[in-house]
């Protein structure tokens, strides 16, 4: 499937319903443990505008303040290992993102943009930690730039040829950087 192709509507609906079951378990865990969360991105738009999923949306994005985020991951790791696996940089060396995914064990879902990922991907929900930012505008920009840089470098490290939603010279430059970062990372591991 290319980045411009869509799921077969029946397959997409089946995926959405399976993700909804994962989300219902998440809600129950949060309620039982007094943890707060919020929906954002396409997920929030879907709830407001469509009273469910956006018809073409294939994921559930959840934000949590850092303390609650860390607590819920710990709960999943300690109490729900029979049903779920936490995918993040702490548990999977090759996980390419700084957020976490809670995946249902025994399922498989690999979106096109992750076709080259070397990490188990299942039917999941995506959790994003929200951290405090400095009051000072200059420090805030520095923090934002740092987070952007390191998160993109992590992605480049794991995807030699990531799916790029750009064209022309920008695509060529970013592709060359991806190959260079991936190669450098590979060489570093070979010499260990």
Q: What residue ranges belong to the model's regions?
A:
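Conserved, surface-exposed functional patches that form binding/active-site neighborhoods
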Residues: 119-172
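Helical scaffold of the NTase/Pol beta-like nucleotidyltransferase catalytic core
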Residues: 1-40
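Internal, conserved structured core segments that host functional sites
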Residues: 88-138
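Short catalytic/ligand-binding loop motif for oxyanion handling, primarily in non-cytosolic enzymes
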Residues: 46-49, 71-73, 134-139
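Low-complexity, serine/threonine/proline-enriched polar segments
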Residues: 174-182
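Conserved small/polar residues in nucleotide/adenosyl-binding loops
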Residues: 184-191
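Metal-dependent nucleotidyltransferase catalytic core
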Residues: 22, 63-103
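Active-site nucleotide-donor binding segment shared across nucleotidyl transfer reactions
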Residues: 27-60, 69
């Amino acid at each position: 499937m290319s980045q411009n192709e869509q799921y077969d509507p029946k397959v997409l609906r089946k995926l959405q319903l399976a993700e909804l079951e994962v989300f219902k378990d998440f809600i129950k865990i949060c309620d039982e443990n007094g943890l707060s969360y919020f929906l954002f991105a396409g997920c929030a738009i879907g709830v407001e505008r469509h009273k469910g999923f956006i018809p073409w949306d294939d994921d559930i994005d959840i934000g949590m303040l850092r303390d609650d985020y860390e607590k819920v991951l710990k709960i999943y790791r300690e109490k729900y290992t029979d049903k779920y696996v936490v995918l993040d940089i702490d548990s999977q060396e090759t996980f390419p993102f700084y957020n976490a995914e809670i995946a249902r064990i025994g399922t498989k879902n690999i979106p096109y943009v992750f076709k080259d990922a070397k990490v188990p991907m299942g039917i999941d929900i995506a959790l994003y930690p929200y951290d405090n930012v400095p009051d000072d505008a200059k420090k805030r920009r520095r923090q934002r730039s740092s987070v952007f840089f390191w998160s993109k470098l992590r992605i480049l490290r794991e995807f030699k040829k990531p799916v790029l939603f750009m064209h022309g010279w920008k695509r060529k430059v970013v592709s060359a950087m991806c190959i260079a970062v991936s190669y450098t990372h590979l060489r570093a591991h070979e010499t260990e």
